Amino acid sequence: QVCCDPRLVKVDAAREVKTSAKAEAFHSFLSEELGRGRRVLVFSQFARMLALLSDELRARGVKHVTLTGASEERHKLVDSFQEGEVDVFLISLKAGGTGLTLTRADTVIHYDPWWNAAAQLQAPDRAHRIGQTQPVFVHKLDVAGSVEERMLELQQKKRALADMLFGKEVGTVRLLPDDVESLLAPLEDER
């Protein structure tokens, strides 16, 4: 969480921070995308992060809606975005990772990486649906030299091993004991 915004960490000094470099980069990038006429989905696994982003968007006068597990009337939020009332939809992984059709979106921003790479890959599918007539651009915001970078490395390593096992190539796959251990180990425990 500290990579997303220090205010998410349960340390008093961190909560006194007014913003983060990542949040500033996000708002700058989002402003550019909206200036290009983009309609944007923003995914985060942290509802508190979405609340911070929402507060700043409101302060900047950017109309948006937010969907988290606590949201009521989910369909009204979706309709608001799909009907063009707002151009930004903030969505938590758990509340919006599946079951939404948001074909008005042409841009997806992953504010933070997820341990579950499959869920992260499904998020852009909210925009890639039957009825989508435009290309969908997917952007990932990651803090260099941080735990986020390590998470991405672990995701890639597991994906490569899975591709080797279940990929399109025909033939016998030979795995070393370390490969099997790496494939089966939880991401958090991999070294």
Predicted regions and their residues:
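SF2 helicase/translocase ATPase core recognition
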Residues: G69-E72, K76-L77, F81, V88-L175
